[in-house]
């Protein structure tokens, strides 16, 4: 088959042969090889096939004028070896449709193309192409693979649910190794083995033999103990560390009162005059560090005003000030001029006290008394 379409002239009708169609795409080299093989041999017309119209061959064909070729219309369109059909010839309306062409003699009529009978099977598509490939010692193209049915996915069936005990794996058994422990003895700073006796006290771990009194080394495991400064002590050693009362000399175990740099029982810290427990009240001391309540101390040691002859003590939560003049004591309100009763100042000013003959006078009164020469 030529690379370009081949044309044949039949009278004035041009028949164009279309190239063969291939169902399977070939490589460019195979196509060129087939074309060269076909150029070397003449065109092979398809073998005539029997048809029901074969009996009409003996009948004379209709008359045609000389110089013109009779156009033969085949009973069925010509089929190519690859199953294609050429395009139909143009239809002539009359004898004068085309001019007379006397250049070439009329070609012989084409052989009739008969339809294949039902008994004879049609030639397989591409038989001539396979024969050409066999001559060139080339392997024929592989037929297209048959369409495969979509693979069925295996049906996944949910497995029956099992109880929770079966799905969860059993917890791993805890292996306790010999001597493996994270507890450290707070006394010897060594590991506390699980097989050893241990004591937990003061938020710490101890070996049983290490938990002892820090003074006498007495075993305290299973015993009552006291804690002082983070150290365990037995009861006798703890009492030895306690303070003793400054009055009776006994150990102060419960409530303690600290005064004068000593410790006292609450019942021992009392007034020496009325024997009343002072507790957390204010107190006063005598010349020999005797403890007095305030009332007894003022009654015994408070100065007496030389004017009103009352003790000078604080009253109504207010402090009392003592004014001393000429060896005598006075209340602030009693420190006045004996003539004009004006309050005298404690400062050495004109408003101060100007005594005369052991009496209190202001400056003006003092001048008058001195000028008169009498008291």
Curated annotation (Swiss-Prot):
Segments for region (Disordered): 43-119, 137-176
InterPro entries in the cross-refs: Znf_LIM (IPR001781)
Domain LIM zinc-binding, first and last residues per copy: 183-244, 245-302, 303-372
Task performed by this protein: Serves as an anchoring site for cell-ECM adhesion proteins and filamin-containing actin filaments. Is implicated in cell shape modulation (spreading) and motility. May participate in the regulation of filamin-mediated cross-linking and stabilization of actin filaments. May also regulate the assembly of filamin-containing signaling complexes that control actin assembly. Promotes dissociation of FLNA from ITGB3 and ITGB7. Promotes activation of integrins and regulates integrin-mediated cell-cell adhesion.
Subcellular location: Cell junction, Focal adhesion; Cytoplasm, Cytoskeleton, Stress fiber
Recorded GO MF terms: filamin binding; metal ion binding
Lineage, broadest ranks: Eukaryota, Metazoa, Chordata, Craniata, Vertebrata
Assembly and interaction partners: Interacts with FERMT2, FLNA, FLNB and FLNC. Interacts with NKX2-5.
A cellular component annotation (GO) from this entry: focal adhesion
Residue ranges of the region described as Filamin-binding: 1-70
Biased composition (Low complexity): 150-159
Protein name (database record): Filamin-binding LIM protein 1
Keyword Oxidoreductase: no
Region of interest: FERMT2-binding: 278-375
Source organism of this protein record: Pongo abelii (Sumatran orangutan)
Record keywords: Cell adhesion, Cell junction, Cell shape, Cytoplasm, Cytoskeleton, LIM domain, Metal-binding, Repeat, Zinc
Pfam family, one: LIM
GN (gene name): FBLIM1
Pro residues: bias regions: 104-114, 140-149
